Amino acid sequence: MRLAFFVKDVATEIDEYATTRLARAALQRGHEVWYVGAEDVELGESDGQLVARAHAAEFTKGDTLESFMRRIKERDIERIVMDDLDALFLRNESVDDLQERPWASPLGVVFGQMLEARGVTVVNDPKSLIRAASKLYLEEFPEKIRPRSLVTRDPEAIKRFVGTVGRSVVKPLYGGRGRNVFMIEDETEANLAQMTEAVLQDGYAIVQEFVEGGEDGDARIFLLEGKILERDGKLAAFRRVPTGTDLRANISVGGRSVPLDIGEVERGVIDAMSEKLVADGMFFVGIDVIGDKVVEINAESTGGIQSVEWLYEIDVCPTVIEALERRTGSKP
């Protein structure tokens, strides 16, 4: 299988990313692997082919993830014809580019749709990823598995919503890594105007009714083709616990990961989501769950696989690559 990982910028990739582990798994199964950054693609004026200035990946005996990634960056750039790929794995985070490089933000789904039309297997499905990259995507799932919410740019509407439902969380509709996420106790919150203003600087806000138990963190569960990702009987899921008084459990803002036992409640949530995720082509996603409610769907470059590896001493990435092999009809 000729596989390329489409990332934000090859130069900023690091060994701890889930993408690094996915690339390692693909190489260890005998596949050809390339890294392509958002600014590395060209459309040939004569033949109309999509061409990329790509970095070849090679995992050798004795490599650590750090040395593996270092050598990817050090290798000479090679030109590859992306039309000839078997699969393209979209691992860029368009939300990260919205502020500093807005021109780069949509390129994953744009190039992905072009290549899909040319016969390349693209995951996650770029046509659906346009919606799924937004927190609005959660609103397409059954009401019973999501908190009450409001999407708006009206500060007064936010205040009215909080006055109706009480304790709430407000965050940017397009955002991640815990940036500009605030807890609002009630509509009389002293800093409500400042918090709302900070969130609305990033565009639309989404306000969610606070889910009881959220102060203790959330569960990050990885789903592959609508089912819990697992390897050798171990499930790819963990609990993210916030530190101190910070409600955000994101690892990127200091949250810590602890083992999680998947119970009937979590399985019921997944069952309610599975059919739609599969229909939408959401091959590999992470969901954040509190109690019986999903508070976020991470459909674009979902991270945290390293926590699964550390907690359970298992590499689940080969299971992801095996599923991709089945999709492309490739053999290891």
Q: What is each of the regions a protein language model found here?
A:
Residues 1-4:
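Extreme N-terminal starter segment of soluble prokaryotic enzymes
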Residues 6-7, 260-332:
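ATP-dependent carboxylate activation and anion-phosphoryl transfer catalytic cores
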Residues 11-28, 34-148:
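Conserved N-proximal alpha/beta basic substrate-recognition cap immediately N-terminal to
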Residues 18-20, 156, 163-166, 177-267, ...:
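Phosphate-binding site of ATP-dependent enzymes
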Residues 27, 116, 162-163, 278:
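Anion (oxyanion) recognition and catalysis
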Residues 92-95, 173-175, 302:
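Short glycine-rich anion-binding loops that position phosphate/pyrophosphate groups of nucleotides
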Residues 143-166:
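Rossmann-like NAD(P)H-binding beta-loop-alpha module
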Residues 168-170, 205-208, 281-286:
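A short linear hydrophobic-aromatic micro-motif
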